[in-house]
Amino acid sequence: MDVSEWQDGLPLSAAAAAGHRFAIVRACDGTYADPVFASHVADARGAGLRVGAYWYVRHPLEGTSLREQAGVVARQLRAAWGPSLDDAPAVWLDAETVAHRLSADDLVAAARALEDAGVACAGTYTTRSYWRLRRFPAFGDGADEMPGGLWLAQWPGTAGPAGADYPGDDHRAWRPFRGRTPDLWQFTDRGSVAGFTVDVDAFRGDEGELAALLAGRGPGTEPSGG
């Protein structure tokens, strides 16, 4: 699942009890630091969940540079994990802003801005329609290709207790897209945990693969079933 200030007060122990393995927490929206990032992180870690982080990337034409935004990400992670960032996760780039749509070059620059701030990039969160509209390239490690893994949002339209409505590991949403099989699939934005509406995400690999993905070491490895 992924959470932000919109789920302030959600006990992530309830998510763990419901069978969730991980929580990806919003660090910031542009330069707006999510005020409950550190508390969500502490709650998730205390509940035994693996923890990831994401940055809602704003186009520079929306008012702040990518470097300024990446600096906020780094400060948020240091507040939650300490100045060395030894145990901090890699950060996902959330590419969905519509005021000024992001380009492939923008996302490559955002990943570099993270690295310059001492933070690893886990990959990109997006939707199929956003990706197609921008005609983004294939994923990979080349200089002009997209960084990291693929976290894809596609909602079949069901709702209910988080995880109960998962369409399954063989659903067409897992099919390869622009040269990559999705590493994570956000399959609903209408899950429910402890009375809170949440986005729910699926991962088909084992615990070691999940840990590697959230640490920024997973792209390019096909997930195993389970």
Task: Describe every region a protein language model picked out.
Residues G30, H59, S129-Y130, S192:
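Positions that flank functional sites
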Residues D2-A16, R21, V25-A120:
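Substrate-binding cleft of extracellular glycoside hydrolase catalytic domains
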Residues D2-S4, D141-G226:
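Functionally critical loop-and-helix segments that line ligand-binding/catalytic clefts
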Residues S84-R172:
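Catalytic domains of cell-wall/extracellular-matrix polysaccharide-remodeling enzymes
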Residues V41, A70, G140-D141, L210:
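Alpha-helix boundary/capping detector
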